[in-house]
């Protein structure tokens, strides 16, 4: 417990919080160029081939970003938009690629949760009366 005089001299130091996505530098999104597209296996007890891409961001940092959804159109040298968000069973993957932005198409045929996967609403034919 500090004395009153110590508080007058030094004050209280507030704790600094460590960010979970440092490469974004406090921005909600960063654009980048895709360098490599690959598949990785998750931690135990899960089993799959998760799609990730190595992306060089506009601030010259290189990060691994997860490609969400079924099927994707991400290729090498594509321009992508990256947001924060960890993948729980992939160590070292702290970012997500935003589908439907820049060179990346949204997931086709998606009916629920469309905004997360860059899918457009299916057009219903207008009926005449």
UniProtKB/Swiss-Prot annotation:
Keyword RNA-binding found: yes
A Gene Ontology BP annotation from the UniProt entry: translation
GO molecular function, one term: tRNA binding
InterPro entries to which the protein is assigned, alphabetical: NA-bd_OB-fold (IPR012340), Ribosomal_uS12 (IPR006032), Ribosomal_uS12_bac (IPR005679)
Classification via Gene3D superfamilies: Nucleic acid-binding proteins (2.40.50.140)
This protein's UniProt keywords: Ribonucleoprotein, Ribosomal protein, RNA-binding, rRNA-binding, tRNA-binding
Disordered: annotated span: 110-129
Pfam families on file: Ribosom_S12_S23
Domain of life: Bacteria
GO annotations of cellular component type: small ribosomal subunit
Keyword RNA-binding annotated: yes
Coiled coil ranges: none
Protein family per UniProt: Belongs to the universal ribosomal protein uS12 family.
Assembly, per entry: Part of the 30S ribosomal subunit. Contacts proteins S8 and S17. May interact with IF1 in the 30S initiation complex.
Function of the protein: With S4 and S5 plays an important role in translational accuracy. Interacts with and stabilizes bases of the 16S rRNA that are involved in tRNA selection in the A site and with the mRNA backbone. Located at the interface of the 30S and 50S subunits, it traverses the body of the 30S subunit contacting proteins on the other side and probably holding the rRNA structure together. The combined cluster of proteins S8, S12 and S17 appears to hold together the shoulder and platform of the 30S subunit.
Protein name stated in the entry: Small ribosomal subunit protein uS12
